[in-house]
């Protein structure tokens, strides 16, 4: 059993969308209290100035980032920072005894050469990075439960890998045949002003970006290779959709056994995720919509087999800011502290 005492928690990078989602979740978590909100760009401002709707729940100010203060006040630290910054802070925090959950890409890779190639940043923390656990609980639950440093997955990899995992682990597909076509809402681009995220630009339009070179590609391939026990290459194309939040990933792959039918795969997926409360395998010809996951930590999976082409099609729907970011980070926190992984996380969406 885990500790039932309130744990002091800090968020560095609290002013962005990931930070405010974390703040909302942690304010309602029964076994933590927020002891520190850090962010240099908003330092000195009451958090309620940035997000007035949370003003009645807390009276914290955003402070300039000071790792000495963080270590003094907290036991657990969430890093919700741009790529490259967590690697400058995590070594000090971990060395001083804090548990760290990083929401950037800095600690997602087992091979830092891959990180350096795709993110263009040289790393000086290879020893620490080698101890990080990839924070996808459905696949790495045991490692997360004993970790001091967790690299929380990206939103696209979360949706894609939950769709692919049973297929790769059970050897049901040609692993290099996987094609991932994914759509995301505009909140995935962050809170900074960007032309393509303006209402006039994004509304009523959908289009691809990062074609053939999106940074989430090697992350998906790394975990897929681990699951398959061999090197896996995937084709991944993301699209920006005219919605605020949500990811819909449609995964196509060639089956090794063309005799398998949809009901077989639903049985296999249901068994694979039988101990995963945040993954819902849908029955029959039911396919998910992003609205179903809105504001929750759930991942919905719909499955189909095209006997004509010999392909399996898996549709995965999540909320990019919840299961794709802050919610999954809290799920990892629960595992690290020995608490039920559903604790403090919303399960039911608002509808319509």
From Swiss-Prot:
The keyword Oxidoreductase belongs to this UniProt entry's keyword annotation: yes
KW Cytoplasm (keyword) present: yes
Compartment(s) of residence: Cytoplasm
Similarity-based family: Belongs to the NAGSA dehydrogenase family. Type 1 subfamily.
Residues at the active site: 155
PANTHER family reported in the protein's UniProt record: N-ACETYL-GAMMA-GLUTAMYL-PHOSPHATE REDUCTASE, CHLOROPLASTIC-RELATED, N-ACETYL-GAMMA-GLUTAMYL-PHOSPHATE REDUCTASE, CHLOROPLASTIC-RELATED-RELATED
GO molecular function, one term: N-acetyl-gamma-glutamyl-phosphate reductase activity
GO biological process terms, semicolon-separated: L-arginine biosynthetic process
Reaction(s) the record says it catalyses: N-acetyl-L-glutamate 5-semialdehyde + phosphate + NADP(+) = N-acetyl-L-glutamyl 5-phosphate + NADPH + H(+)
Domain of life: Bacteria
Primary location group: cytoplasm
Keywords noted in UniProt: Amino-acid biosynthesis, Arginine biosynthesis, Cytoplasm, NADP, Oxidoreductase
Entry-linked InterPro entries: AGPR_AS, AGPR_type-1, NAD(P)-bd_dom_sf, NAGSA_dehydrogenase, Semialdehyde_DH_NAD-bd
Example of a GO cellular component annotation carried by this entry: cytoplasm
Record protein name field: N-acetyl-gamma-glutamyl-phosphate reductase
Pathway(s) it belongs to: Amino-acid biosynthesis; L-arginine biosynthesis; N(2)-acetyl-L-ornithine from L-glutamate: step 3/4
Enzyme Commission designation: 1.2.1.38
Function per UniProt: Catalyzes the NADPH-dependent reduction of N-acetyl-5-glutamyl phosphate to yield N-acetyl-L-glutamate 5-semialdehyde.
EC class of the enzyme, as a word: oxidoreductase
């Amino acid at each position: 059993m885990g500790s039932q005492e309130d744990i002091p928690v800090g968020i560095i990078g609290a002013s962005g969308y990931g930070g405010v989602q974390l703040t909302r979740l942690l304010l309602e978590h029964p076994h933590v209290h927020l002891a520190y909100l850090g962010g240099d760009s908003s330092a000195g401002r009451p958090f309620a100035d940035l997000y007035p709707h949370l003003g009645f729940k807390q009276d914290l100010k955003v402070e300039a980032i000071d790792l000495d203060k963080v270590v003094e006040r907290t036991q657990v630290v969430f890093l919700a920072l741009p790529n490259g910054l967590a690697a400058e802070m995590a070594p000090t925090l971990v060395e001083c005894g804090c548990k760290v959950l990083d929401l950037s890409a800095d600690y997602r890779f087992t091979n830092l050469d891959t990180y350096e190639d795709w993110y263009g940043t040289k790393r000086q923390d290879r020893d620490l990075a080698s101890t990080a656990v990839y924070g996808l609980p459905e696949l790495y639950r045991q490692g997360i439960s004993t970790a001091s440093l967790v690299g929380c997955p990206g939103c696209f990899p979360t949706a894609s890998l939950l769709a692919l995992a049973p297929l790769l682990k059970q050897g049901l597909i040609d692993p290099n045949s996987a094609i991932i076509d994914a759509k995301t809402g505009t909140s995935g681009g962050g809170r900074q002003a960007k032309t393509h995220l303006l209402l006039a630009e994004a509304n009523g339009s959908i289009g691809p970006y990062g074609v053939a070179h999106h940074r989430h590609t090697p992350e998906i391939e790394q975990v897929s290779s681990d699951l398959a026990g061999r090197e896996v290459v995937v084709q991944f194309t993301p699209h920006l959709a005219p919605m605020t939040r949500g990811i819909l990933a449609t995964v196509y792959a060639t089956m090794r056994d063309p005799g398998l039918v949809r009901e077989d795969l639903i049985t296999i997926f249901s068994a694979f995720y039988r101990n995963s409360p945040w993954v819902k395998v849908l029955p029959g010809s039911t396919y998910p919509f992003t609205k179903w996951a809105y504001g929750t930590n759930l991942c919905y999976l719909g499955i189909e087999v095209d006997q004509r082409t010999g392909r399996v099609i898996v549709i995965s729907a999540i909320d990019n800011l919840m299961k794709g970011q802050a919610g999954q980070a809290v799920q990892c926190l629960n595992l690290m502290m020995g608490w039920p992984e559903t604790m403090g996380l919303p399960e039911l969406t608002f509808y319509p």
